[in-house]
């Protein structure tokens, strides 16, 4: 980053922020699709049943914890790789 001028740093930051937003939207979309498919089975009412609500809460918590754990492992692997390369 130090080798970039101010304009290049701003452009780099913009690209990083766009990628982060895209990744967040993909995560959210996957969460909604998976939990809805797994938990919502009754389409006779426009409201969720208490069983469906509970299922969605558990599903989303589990999904987010899993995503967080994967992110942590990725950071650990990246740090180990950087350390082994002498960075």
UniProtKB/Swiss-Prot annotation:
Biological process, per Gene Ontology: protein insertion into mitochondrial inner membrane
* A GO cellular-component term linked to this record: mitochondrial intermembrane space protein transporter complex
Major localization listed first in the record, in broad terms? mitochondrion
Residue positions of motif Twin CX3C motif? 35-59
Domain remarks: The twin CX3C motif contains 4 conserved Cys residues that form 2 disulfide bonds in the mitochondrial intermembrane space. However, during the transit of TIM9 from cytoplasm into mitochondrion, the Cys residues probably coordinate zinc, thereby preventing folding and allowing its transfer across mitochondrial outer membrane.
Name under which the protein is recorded: Mitochondrial import inner membrane translocase subunit TIM9
Q: Name the gene.
A: TIM9
Check the record and name the PANTHER family matching this protein.
Answer: MITOCHONDRIAL IMPORT INNER MEMBRANE TRANSLOCASE SUBUNIT TIM9B
- Family recorded in the similarity comment: Belongs to the small Tim family.
């Amino acid at each position: 980053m130090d080798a970039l001028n101010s304009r290049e740093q701003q452009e780099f930051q913009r690209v990083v922020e766009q990628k982060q937003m895209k990744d967040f939207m993909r995560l959210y979309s996957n969460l909604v699709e998976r939990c809805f498919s797994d938990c919502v089975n009754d389409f006779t009412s426009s409201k969720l049943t208490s069983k469906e609500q509970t299922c969605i809460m558990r599903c989303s918590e589990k999904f987010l914890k899993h995503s967080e754990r994967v992110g942590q492992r990725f950071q650990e692997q990246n740090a180990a790789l950087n350390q082994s390369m002498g960075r």
